[in-house]
């Protein structure tokens, strides 16, 4: 636990016997809860790192940091800390010089005290009622200023003694003043609701909770008297000095401090972190403090002039006693050519000195008395509008011409002369400067006239040099080189490398004070450093040589080898903790080289990195708007400035060509804009016709264009009626009368049965049974029978019943046959319906699947439409901004007519009505100056905008050529994705592009290799991919693959895909903090700077309540449309979610029909068919037997014929021809 001391403090009384001395006893048990808020100062004046910093704030003269980290100079180096356990009624004095540090809590320093901090170290809200009644600041010169606050406003200049500055939370507002002899000199403002810290610097700054409340002359001592309270609080008094530190701030309070007091802490400060990981870090350049000045000039005969400027200040008191500097204060220049208004330097050298006098007056303007007490003031000359400071004139600044003047005529810039009082700086006059840049005249600190070589060199140490006009900071060293030509020598980048002394011809080198280095940090300590020169740094004394750099380390290389020998002969066997390319550093600081080829026969990557490559895409249409022209603006300058007032127009002529320049600039810009737009765009009448939807749908418009093509748009849009369903003239239909006279019966038929039946009957009902049809071998008749058929078959049935007993039942046979045939028709219909039912169910399920897929595509389309609407909304927002920008600029220009620019009114006529002509001219001159400034700002903005539009117009040309007329290979140029095609259309003031691109929806992450490091015997070489569009990676199967970066399509790498490089070393280029400004120039926000300037003058403006009805400019308001598009986009997104649910529901509605049973019945042939078959068989078999057995030469018929023939005719027997065998089938 920290040891806490509270010392006995006896302070001299400054208010007589009214207050007793402050008696403080040692802290006992009551201090136990305050240990977290009070610290013991560490050796060197450092605050412990575990201190909570309750109620410690960053002191600032400008804005306050809310949260973050920054490196800053703050009074955080504690010389002495006094803890006080409670407020006592006492009066105490604290001085910056000669303070008694005999008894302090912790270490004590004897440094110069810069700031005394009073901290209420308590975390809870302590109620006010304890604190100082008044703070007295004993400034230089013996003047004592008092600061106190009151709970209400005080109207007179006399303040009673009830004021106070309470510590802790205050009840209600407290109004603070600076007092002198009981008279208010200045109102400071309202006290914060809770006072946690009061800090006072010896330079006269008074801080409350870190904010600069008040500034005055330097302070010697601080006195205050304490009130008495009934609650125990704890506070400390810290005597502090400024030091550089890394400060972490949260909610405006300090939470952590890292002192930039050592090499490793300097790196922490440069990296803005209190903890450093193991690795290499650039060593930040140390700040060059007060160094010697080296100047190298050519020997010459010089003349010198002393320019003495005398400033006589006139001071008065206000009605409340505040000091006021009179504008009648005079500036006296040396007389030249009987003129004291202008003085020009006519010698080779000059030195400027300022002498200040101060006289005071009571109520008149006769300044005779000496300035005493609060009226004491000193003249100071501030920079003003000049690009150099007044106090730097004697610091070897060079000119071709330099003059000081009391009149602004012909001046290039001016210095501001102010009277510095104990409360503030008050502007009194301006000192004008007429100068030309060059080297003829030099400002020097002292007289060096005559023939001299004024060169002053400080060798082998860091010096601020000016060598033949080239300035910088570096170390100048004498060399042994001899160069015949040249005066000074620079590198290709323009840095000064050396110079020659023309008197003796000696060559001197110039090197930076700090060189670039990389520090190796392991476990928070510096173990080594890499540098380009052989010079000790970072307190590292051991070093070794590598082929490319020097390495300094804590490792003692001299134990075994000679100090400074190459690293190759100092092989160290240790495991590197950090690596840098092929360099490794061990924990003991030893440097080792890592050979990337030392592996078990496996190849190694030169370097690797994870990349994501698309595997799937979706098509997206992205909208982009580009402005290509602006609306020309012309302004009547004299009308704008003077509004037709003749006296104002006469004054305006004194501004030479101001109006002409403004008007010509706008006109020239407009003409140039129109010429470029006309050369870029042309209007086609046919294109204008096509731009109309009505004309596009008209074939008359397209006929002259597409004579040899079908009329695109017109023909097909008009011809829709030809492809819509219509009546077919070839088909025959019954008329409406026929539909009334006949009953229409619709049935389901079997194939062509019905048509064949109708064709057979010919309309005769008697042919019904005769025309019976057969379907798949079964006799059928149509199922519908008209009245005649029913009568016929009824009669047949009745006749059969009646004659059945008499043997006439056969009459009913037609009826029975017809009934069975019709029943067969119905049965076959049922079979066909069953098959149709199966076909229907299959088709329905297939339709459901198609519907599901269709809805999925609709869902995707709506999703893409939603994204498209979003891009359209963004493009419309940009269109709206472009269209309204010029209107807003004109509106802002019109608003400037309301500003009076510190004149008594913004109306010129009103000014001339209220003042005499001379005074009115002065007021109107302010209006003219202000309005011309506004016009200049508008012209500058317009010309800048035109330059931006000119660049945008060129971009539109490039996009038309690359995106619309061709396909771009540049990713992201034609939409954010892989470009397919683009369409362009006109838009307000520009063009709108519709880019169709492929957007990745899925990715594959691979570890890409920049190249392969291979070993060939003793030679190490690298292989890199020949085509840079391909990515090399190694898969899990240890094979190398190549894939395009645009889509993941891996293929096996072959030897033809690689080219060989010499080595595997990777070159890392580093820079230091000092080099960053040359790489990243400081960004200066001009708009913010102008805004800050305007804010400083705004309280002095009088802005009348004027309407803006006179201003009329088209204002494009697409906010509602953009909001509607965004709403529709969101609604479409919600629709996609609903469609996804509907698709799931549709998938659950697939039909599973219950099939009808199919019964197959084999119908036997009738009996008469079998009888007929039997008769045919009985007749045909004997006939066949007869033909086969009785014919031929051996047949009985043939034998019988031969016998008969031989008997009756001998002659015929001789001419016998054999009979051939005949088969009868």
UniProtKB/Swiss-Prot annotation:
The keyword Transcription does not apply. Disulfide bonds: none annotated. InterPro entries: ALPHA_CORONA_SPIKE, CoV_S1_C, S2_sf_CoV, Spike_S1_CoV, Spike_S2_CoV, Spike_S2_CoV_C, Spike_S2_CoV_HR1, Spike_S2_CoV_HR2. A motif (KxHxx) lies at residues 1221-1225. Residues 798-819 are annotated as: Fusion peptide. Residues 13-1166 are virion surface. Residues 1081-1178 are annotated as: Heptad repeat 2 (HR2). The chain crosses the membrane at residues 1167-1186. CDD domains: TGEV-like_Spike_SD1-2_S1-S2_S2 (cd22377). Residues 880-924, 1114-1156 form a coiled coil. Residues 1-12 form the signal peptide. Residues 813-932 are annotated as: Heptad repeat 1 (HR1). Its main location: virion. It holds the Pfam family CoV_S1. Belongs to the alphacoronaviruses spike protein family. HAMAP family: ALPHA_CORONA_SPIKE (MF_04200). Homotrimer. During virus morphogenesis, found in a complex with M and HE proteins. Interacts with host ANPEP. This is Spike glycoprotein. The gene is S.
